[in-house]
């Protein structure tokens, strides 16, 4: 023995005496052990461990290797009086904790003393712990941090056959440390099913001559029960003449039938053979399927098979359960319960039951031998789940689920020859098919060379192209910079502070980036919650139902964001949890609110872990007096900003076929002029055969899913010309339902729900109503006084006379302006005006004085009077008031506790609503009866061309602050009212008072509102009014005709509002299949990155954005949707965790410019403006070829981008980089809290300035070769903006910037010749609009807006658009 060896032995003896002797005295090391099979191999195992640096131990499940081998080593250390420190890895947290608990019980010591565990943030250990169970990730992180494993005497890696990415990388690290600084540590590799030779070969060690492969020890376990194997070719009695298509893995309809028959065979025949009728309950059938869709299909086929068995004695009593990873915890628990006597449990499971979950009473296994495997295309970063044949190792593992407590059978639904000769022995390692981002970051933290050289040491090294693409993605994310010590490297890059944090967090890197940006933008707490929720499988329940969708809308609170839905749900749960009386209250609340309690608890645990890890890297919320504070509404916008930054370049543009203008025109024609924001339609109803109003109740039932309270808020209309049924949802989107569920924008929540109802079925879901035979229908409808039948016209609905139509106060076509008083304000887009002309004032005062005069006695209604919707009464202006006014009954509600009926009434002369008991109503009879025939004295109005500011109200509804300000400015006051248009009896107006700024403009100036385009139908009406008013000013005859037209039509008719009637059930003998409901506002999304631009896009079904509608149809600028994750299904992209971005013009391009690695501005031919932007990693400086073409993102601009914008964006990018900057020898930024506080305040200042800046609209022009980079002369980063030179001197961070400064625009002024041409062109368009000539066959093009105009009305409407007016303003045309 050499002197060095003697020193080492002496050190070990001292260490053992100091650190182990107290433990030998404290704990019992001579325990009596159980008789597990592995006990017979104990001496051999210990001898091999002593003699070899690495051993491979293979043994079947249940042989005892996981619990006993570490204890063998522990006890041997006691007998040999040696130091030991053992660590054992498990692939799953629950396994590590439960095994540690079991071993501590066997050793009769408290958990956390001699035996402990560590999983994520949960740890149970102490200085005494010598046997530690942990997850693979915990050991890997520990070894990366310490860069040695000499701290451990024994490293035991269990379940290595699973070959997950972390395990493969851990094997690299362990082998590397064995060969360098940890040669004395013993390594034991263990698994139930393992390709032992490959592992033994991988861990071979050099000797004097050649190499020594790691020895393999096999432990056999004599099975107590037999499991017989059967294959598809053994099932002759069940088979039809059908051959499996092995080239295309999947399940045909025939094979579902085979499996269903097999279940029946198991239930009938086998139980007779085994006498199961004598058992307390019948053993379970476990069916392995590849995914949730297949589980659903198998469930359907099984139940259908049962329904076809007529004889009840032959019908099996099956209790069918589903089992998969996203199943709520309370549903998973049912799988483990014993079935009722005489019942047989059938479990339809994914591979979760293969190893993660054990069902004890399984006798029969039906295995389709399929699995769903995740593959990631590293060039696009799109992941896809492929169905493929399982490996033999998987099938053996599945077989092991049976034969635990009784004999069993496994039926493999493949031919024996295929199983034995063509199925792989083991599944391909994850490292070859899954994302490598986390692995490469861990490789960078190891500091042992470039990532590709480290990963080349893997058992199955990934392709170099996959490593290259992953490095490019990490550079795009900001985890790596483009260079290594200043030199560009394609396969490597220096690690940034952002990259270090990403490597420390147990999350997808994009989610980690969301947290980092949350820190920069002062929303760290919220970003952590959203990130943790996105990392969970799904905290929401009932996603495949309209109720679940409504609940998700409720949690999203009008934000249109899945991330914000997670945030709101978690905060509500946490608050409720603090107040809840007991666990059952909490469980029932979460179920009621469609939340998964277990997922929320796991999420809370993960939030604690994330915060703990962030504290270790110096990232925590600043708490000083100067810290940034956001209002709740600002916070919604900022959260969307950081999502746009974190999930760049997953940007999608919602598109309507043919463009916005065409969509608006089509909406108008498809709905017959009805409002697309609250109307849906069905097709397939033949009005010549059927009388629509008889089936109104059925139509409402289809859309209300049994909630009859919703029927009052639906109006059903029938169109004879198109054979369509229209359903309008009453009340606006901002008057949301009691659940508070709504979406951003103007579209009613019930329109979203209606389309969701259709999409939950097939894409063209057919809805059925039952109808009467025509003769019966005519007879019944006539009897009910619903109308009458005409041979020439068919059914004619009942109509009512509108008397005194000439007294209507709704602005007539000749009224350009009027003087009115504001009588009631609901919000800026809904208020009521009463004209102040003498005639109207006299009528109003007459009504008011008589209703409140002692000379007129108001009579009560009889107690048994039947009130009806639409009836006019006299009612007190408010509860308990003695002032009465005319009111119309709108809807009612029965109060069960008191028996009262409460009515919502609308006051016709004031414009407000109230809820009153019917005892408060008085008759309008006798001398007051004439009042029933006078139209209301107020009309509904909306401020024209404005909408809520997207910054203070991202939900698109008016805030309480803006409504209160509007009330202060207007309520009870008199204004000059300029009438823009009247649509559906609602006037779009401008409110003016003397020389003051119009109210519309003032609200924009105060930042409460932003500009809004008027709707297509509003512009149509505006054009018609302007032309008619122009004709009146030029022609006295026209003026006379228009003024007196109303007097010639004193009797007007409208379809009467009919009470809902239901024909007798026995007369509904026919069926009509309807298609719908449909909305003309339905849109699709398109990707903006090169690799996705030609692929159709779907939003995942459980997203709040799974129904995409054009929520602001009048707005012409592009909206943007951001997805956290994107995966491929066939040729289709599926977006998960989607968020609709704020309705701010230019928001998408602004976000791309703020968060992209670099960009290039594309200009028009004259270089007078930027028409599109190209962002990405840039191009090769020599060839001009894109460095990462698949991720290049192109966006066209529809707003004007200025040098001021670039200056502000550069200031923001520089500040973000400053916050994240570390010098090369630093791992954490060295700023004090005050410096960070100031920098974050600057971030707030810059982002608010960028978002609030009002930009002019411009026409969309696509630059040629949108995705091609153009070689340009290198710009010095310091020249990117005038202010950046000073910054560069102050603090040099641009050697490794994540967000380098963008180049200046360098635009040229518009030439005088071009200006002159555009002005002449404008004059020509305005002249043409005044004529009645026909336009050329293919229309004309507005040269300023690049818009084709096919008809004169289109031309006139275009001239009113903000785009055209902004363009006129830019060229100074008057």
UniProtKB/Swiss-Prot annotation:
Keywords, sorted A to Z: ATP-binding, Cytoplasm, Developmental protein, Differentiation, Helicase, Hydrolase, Meiosis, Nucleotide-binding, RNA-mediated gene silencing, Spermatogenesis
GO biological process, one term: meiotic cell cycle
Binding site for ATP: 59-66
One MF annotation (Gene Ontology) recorded for this entry: ATP hydrolysis activity
Keyword Nucleotidyltransferase: no
Gene3D superfamilies for this protein: 1.20.120.1080, 2.30.30.140, 2.40.50.90, P-loop containing nucleotide triphosphate hydrolases
Pfam families membership: DEAD (PF00270), HA2_C (PF21010), Helicase_C (PF00271), TUDOR (PF00567)
Helicase ATP-binding domain boundaries: 46-212
Broad enzyme group: hydrolase
Residue ranges constituting the Helicase C-terminal domain according to the UniProt record: 265-447
Highest taxon of the lineage: Eukaryota
The name this protein goes by in its record: Probable ATP-dependent RNA helicase spindle-E
Organism encoding this protein: Aedes aegypti
Name of the gene: spn-E
